[in-house]
């Protein structure tokens, strides 16, 4: 059985009140971390492209896109002043930031039980060498959706324009991620990232845009329909 088959739930409608609450939670996070909104959508778009390269089924692509959009929702528990710090963080501040994957999982747990969504939120900072957080998973212990989001998250963070840092070029970002293949990132996910050209912003964007923005539409009513 493939990894994505292990994570595929039976499809059922989610209760409408949970859908609305999840949409509200997403908007709260985007209001708390304004830069996080563009980052979340860019990560979701790239995640879908990577997921398609693994031939994930459509419903799994929907779920991984929701997880990617919400991957940093736990930063709601991180003070805005810490998120907006222009320089390096203190050790105490860094520990607070590192808590966001587990905090995000806790925030969405009453609303979503889908394993792909939950794994993307909780485990996108795990490393294949076992030195990540929050649970220090190693290699294939990290579900494929989380390994995919980890690569997309890092790439988009490296090329993002921020007031306090100079973005990498796509080539520089890709080179840095390739250097970390096998230690921080799944080598197969990295290989597929290398194969994806920068047509992300042109060819196929209309197909992936709906995945990336679903959780913010119509009070969350545009969320994919899957078993919680």
Q: Each predicted region: which residue ranges?
A:
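Histidine- and acidic-residue-rich, metal-dependent catalytic cores
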Residues: 4-8, 12-228
